[in-house]
Amino acid sequence: MSPLARTPRKTSVLDTVEHAATTPDQPQPYGELGLKDDEYRRIRQILGRRPTDTELAMYSVMWSEHCSYKSSKVHLRYFGETTSDEMRAAMLAGIGENAGVVDIGDGWAVTFKVESHNHPSYVEPYQGAATGVGGIVRDIMAMGARPVAVMDQLRFGAADAPDTRRVLDGVVRGIGGYGNSLGLPNIGGETVFDPCYAGNPLVNALCVGVLRQEDLHLAFASGAGNKIILFGARTGLDGIGGVSVLASDTFDAEGSRKKLPSVQVGDPFMEKVLIECCLELYAGGLVIGIQDLGGAGLSCATSELASAGDGGMTIQLDSVPLRAKEMTPAEVLCSESQERMCAVVSPKNVDAFLAVCRKWEVLATVIGEVTDGDRLQITWHGETVVDVPPRTVAHEGPVYQRPVARPDTQDALNADRSAKLSRPVTGDELRATLLALLGSPHLCSRAFITEQYDRYVRGNTVLAEHADGGMLRIDQSTGRGIAVSTDASGRYTLLDPYAGAQLALAEAYRNVAVTGATPVAVTNCLNFGSPEDPGVMWQFTQAVRGLADGCADLGIPVTGGNVSFYNQTGSAAILPTPVVGVLGVIDDVRRRIPTGLGAEPGETLMLLGDTRDEFDGSVWAQVTADHLGGLPPVVDLAREKLLAAVLSSASRDGLVSAAHDLSEGGLAQAIVESALAGETGCRIVLPEGADPFVLLFSESAGRVLVAVPRTEESRFRGMCEARGLPAVRIGVVDQGSDAVEVQGLFAVSLAELRATSEAVLPRYFG
C-alpha cells in the first residue's frame, strides 16, 4: 500500500485550511508519510497551524530525499563553487532546471540529463524502467527541445542469481518498449552484473534533446492572470508516492511485495503525441513556462512553477481530469501518473493552446492561474485545502549535514592488493585468460540486450553499438553532430571514491574523444546507499568532490544531475556508483572515428598512453579470483585532455581510421572488440621487454588503441611526439586473416571469439 493511501479517503469533514486552524491537536500520520518529528514541527511553524491532510501529503513528498535532496544539497553546492565563468560560458541552463542546456554553435543547443528509476524497477521491472525513460524524456521536452536519443546505465545482481532474470527481462523490455514506441534511438550505455545489486538494481536513463537557442523554455510561473493548463493523460491512483517516497527508503526483508502500488504505469504512445503537441505549442509561442509532471506530480509542478516565478498561484484541484473515482485531494495532488505536463499560458493564447491540444487529441484543462500574491492556494470544490508559501515546499525544505566518517574497513580494503594473485605467463595461459574474460558476464557481448532496442530510427544515428560513444547528426546541411557516453565503476569507487568518480569521468570523456568529438559538458547520476550511514556519506562526499574537481581540471561544466540514495537492503549497500555522462560536439559527423578495424588496407595499430601494472579492482581480478581490494588505477586528467586534443586533430586531418578506448579488460579486450566490429584479423607484436600479461590486461587509464592508415603513420607519430603523448606501434591489421594473433604467444580465430562472447547472455537469460 502506498503511504499516501493511508491518509483518510472519506471523512465526514473535508480537512480544509479553516478546519485545520480550529483543530490543532488532531493526530496526523506524518511518520508514515516519511516525515521526521522535527520536520513536522517545522511545517507547523511555517504555517502557524497544523497542516491539512492535503498539505501534509504535499510537504511529505516534496521534502522526501528524492525530491528535496536534503542529505546531498549541502555537498552538491561544490559543483557550483568549482565552476569557473569560462566553464559557464556555453551553458544556457544549468543545475536547478529540468535539464542542462549547452550552446553547441550555429544557433543550436543541446539538452541532456540522466536520472534514476532504481527502486521502481525492482518492484515492477517493466513499468519501472519504461516510466524511467518516459520521465527523463519529459524533462528534455520541458526545456523546449525535441528528444532525439536515449541511453541507459544498468546494474543487476549476479547473472546466475535467481531473481536477476526477472529483473533484467522486465527492465530491458521496458526500456525497449517505451523508447522504441517513441521512435528514439538507443545509442549506448552499460550493463554490469555484481552481487551487490541483487535486490537493488540500478536503472539510470539518459535522454538527449536538440533545440534552436531561441526555443529554450524554463520552468517558472510569471505574470498575474496567466493561466495554468494541465495537459496530457488523465490523473489516476498509479504511482502515488512512487519515486518520491519509494525512492527515499530502503527495501526490507519483504522486498518488493508491499510496494507494488507505488510504481507508475506508462503509455509511450500518449507521450509520443505529447512530444509533437509540445513542439507545436513552442513553435506557436503559446507557452510562457512549463514543467513536466514526474516525481510528486502536481505537488511538484505547481510549487516549483510558483516558487521560480514572481507571484503566487491558485489551483482548482477538482478541475483535474481523473481516471479513478473518489480520489482525495491529496491523491490528486501527489499522483505520479505519467505523460502529463503543466504550462503557464497568457489568457489571450488559451484558446489557441487548447486548439493545438485538440488537434493532437491531447486532453487539456485550465486548472488555475498566476496571482500577484506570494501563496500557493489550492481549492477542492470551492474549499481551500492548501495555503502555503510555495518556496517552503519546493526549494526551502530541510537541509541535513549528515555525519561523515571514513569506514573502519577502508584501510584493510586498500591493503588487500591483487599482486598476491597468480598471473598467467605462458601463451596458453594468456589465451585462456582472454577467453575467460570474454566469456564472462562482465565482458561478453551485450547484443542480446541491445538488439531489443532500435538504434537507428530517424536515420540520424552515426555511431551506436560497438562504438565507445553514441553519435548523432543534428544538422543535415552542415553535418554538425553530437557524441554522448555514460560510464561508471562501482568497484573502483569502493576502493577510492574520489578517484573512482574521476575515473568514471575520464572514461566517459575519453569515450567521446575517440569518436573525434570534443567533450563540452557533463551530467551525472549519483547512486549510493543510505545517507544515514556515515560511511556511505563519506563515499558520497568524496565522489562529489572528485567529480567536481575533475570537471574543473578538464574545463567542462556539470550541467545537472540526480542523486539516488537508499540503494540498499537492510545494512547491505550497493557499491557506490556515480554514473557520469559526457556530451561532445563534432562539426561534421563525416569525420567521425569508428571502432572497427579494416577501414583502410594494412592499417598500423598503435597504443596511446602509458601502461602500468594496475590490476586492483580489475575485471581480471574479479573473474579469476573474485577479488576486490587495493587501489584503483592512477587518473591523469591532463593526459586525458591531451588525448582528446590529439584525437580531434587526427580526426580532422584524416590520420586515424579507427579508435577504441582501453578500460575493462585492457588492451586485449579493446583489440578483440575492434577486430570483431571490423570483422577483420590483426597481428599484435608486443614491444621488446614488455610483460605480456601487463600490456594485454592492465586497466591503466588514459589509453587508446588507434588504427592509422599506413601512409599516415609517420605523420601521426610526429604529431604525438610533438605533443608529448606516448605512442607505441603494437601491430598491424591483416584483412586477409580471420584471427587475432599475439605473435609468439597465441592466436584465436574471430569465429571462436565471437561465439565465446555472444553465447553468454542467451545462456543466462535466453
Curated annotation (Swiss-Prot):
It comes from the Bacteria. Its EC number is 6.3.5.3. CDD domains: PurL_repeat1 (cd02203), PurL_repeat2 (cd02204). GO terms for cellular component: cytoplasm. Mg(2+) 1 binds at E115, N562. It is an enzyme of class 6 (ligase). The active site is at H66, H117. It catalyses: N(2)-formyl-N(1)-(5-phospho-beta-D-ribosyl)glycinamide + L-glutamine + ATP + H2O = 2-formamido-N(1)-(5-O-phospho-beta-D-ribosyl)acetamidine + L-glutamate + ADP + phosphate + H(+). Pfam families: AIRS (PF00586), AIRS_C (PF02769), FGAR-AT_linker (PF18072). Disulfide bonds: none annotated. Substrate binds at S116, H117, N118, H119, R138, Q264, E336, S337, Q338, S564. One of its GO terms (biological process) is 'de novo' IMP biosynthetic process. One of its GO terms (molecular function) is phosphoribosylformylglycinamidine synthase activity. Pathway: Purine metabolism; IMP biosynthesis via de novo pathway; 5-amino-1-(5-phospho-D-ribosyl)imidazole from N(2)-formyl-N(1)-(5-phospho-D-ribosyl)glycinamide: step 1/2. Keywords: ATP-binding, Cytoplasm, Ligase, Magnesium, Metal-binding, Nucleotide-binding, Purine biosynthesis. ATP binds at Y69, K113, N524, G561. It is found in: Cytoplasm. Belongs to the FGAMS family. NCBIfam families: FGAM_synth_II, PRK01213.1. This is Phosphoribosylformylglycinamidine synthase subunit PurL. It comes from Mycobacterium tuberculosis (strain CDC 1551 / Oshkosh). The gene is purL.
